[in-house]
Swiss-Prot record:
Name this protein carries in UniProt: D-lactate dehydrogenase
Function, in words: Fermentative lactate dehydrogenase.
A Pfam family assignment: 2-Hacid_dh_C
Catalytic residues in the record: 234, 263, 295
Listed PANTHER family: 2-HYDROXYACID DEHYDROGENASE HOMOLOG 1-RELATED
Catalysis: reaction(s): (R)-lactate + NAD(+) = pyruvate + NADH + H(+)
InterPro entries: D-isomer_2_OHA_DH_cat_dom, D-isomer_DH_CS, D-isomer_DH_CS1, D-isomer_DH_NAD-bd, NAD(P)-bd_dom_sf
Annotated Gene Ontology cellular component terms: cytosol
Length: 329
């Protein structure tokens, strides 16, 4: 099978090539996004492999179909960028990687949490300038505080497992409670309760039409003053404009974002010599109590190996006509 891989970085290529030694697919790597204009580059390929910011809308899928593509392989868990109804109508099979390394994402979320709490990012900059003052670096002891986790799939449960080690009270919201979470002593509550009682809130849920801007002005108003929020899931779970206002009035004490709702034209690229045109992003990133990372929570050697293995195994199952447990349509 010939496979066109879009949005490729060197780390993608390295691990896909290593894992492909066991599969023998013909891999063609492209460093640009899949769009309606670039879909023609998949000509002659039976499958395409895409990531979070590639375009899987109906026009793109129709173009891929014209060029003989049969399979769409997402090398990520989220699939909100793919029109599944259109794929089904066109007879295209879509597969994903539902769980690759939950601990990798959870550990990154914890890293953001600790960095924000103890102002490590600010201390790093100060000490580089020989400024060893501790003024303005006071954090809080996490032991005994309340953590609210929204979404208790594998990543959410991994997060809860770590937070339990901090000695925190654990609250969670998910329409489908997890037995693994309950075993950790997690208390499932409704969103208003989670918002009002949590000192720290961490998002670990997929993006759906129902939870778009889940954290909006109304949600922020229900939260404790000075709440910490960390998002390693999907950017559009947070209303960025409302977050700015909540930061200004100190409702949000600190905000960690590994994802951003308009990240498509920013993340995964070197923009250090560019003038960022996104004014909302610029306002957020200018805040000393906001920490951005560029959608890197998944980026460990173990996770990249797992993603590559599952992606190619999914395609192998489809090629052989076997049942694929990760098939969406």
């Amino acid at each position: 099978m010939k496979l066109a891989v879009y949005s490729t970085k060197q780390y993608d290529k390295k691990y896909l090539q290593q894992v492909n030694e066991s599969f023998g697919f013909e891999l063609e790597f492209f460093d640009f996004l899949l769009t309606e204009k670039t879909a023609k580059t998949a000509n002659g390929c039976e499958a395409v492999c895409i990531f979070v910011n590639d375009d899987g809308s109906r026009p793109v899928l129709e173009e891929l179909k014209k060029h003989g593509v049969k399979y769409i392989a997402l090398r990520c868990a989220g699939f909100n960028n793919v029109d599944l109804d259109a794929a089904k109508e066109l007879g295209l099979k879509v597969v994903r990687v539902p769980a690759y390394d939950p601990e990798a994402v959870a550990e990154h979320a914890i890293g953001m949490m600790m960095t924000l709490n103890r102002r490590i990012h600010r201390a790093y900059q100060r000490t580089r300038d020989a400024n060893f003052s501790l003024e303005g670096l006071t954090g809080f002891t996490m032991y005994g505080k309340t953590a609210g986790v929204i979404g208790t799939g594998k990543i959410g449960v991994a997060m809860l497992r770590i937070l339990k080690g901090f000695g925190m009270r654990l609250l969670a919201f998910d329409p489908y409670p997890s037995a693994a979470a309950l075993e950790l002593g997690v208390e499932y509550v409704d969103l208003p309760t989670l918002f009002s009682e949590s000192d720290v809130i961490s998002l670990h849920c997929p993006l759906t039409p129902e939870n778009y801007h889940l954290l909006n002005e109304a949600a922020f108003e229900q939260m404790k003053n000075g709440v910490m929020i960390v998002n390693t899931s999907r950017g559009a779970l947070i209303d960025s404009q409302a977050a700015i206002e909540a930061l200004k009035n100190q409702k949000i004490g600190s905000l960690g974002m590994d994802v951003y709702e308009n990240e498509r034209d920013l993340f995964f690229e070197d923009k250090s010599n560019d003038v960022i045109q996104d004014d909302v992003f610029r306002r957020l990133s200018a805040c000393h109590n906001v920490l951005f990372t560029g959608h890197q929570a998944f980026l460990t050697a173990e996770a990249l190996t797992s993603i590559s293995q599952t992606t190619l195994q999914n395609l192998s199952n489809l090629e052989k006509g076997e049942t694929c447990p990760n098939e969406l349509v």
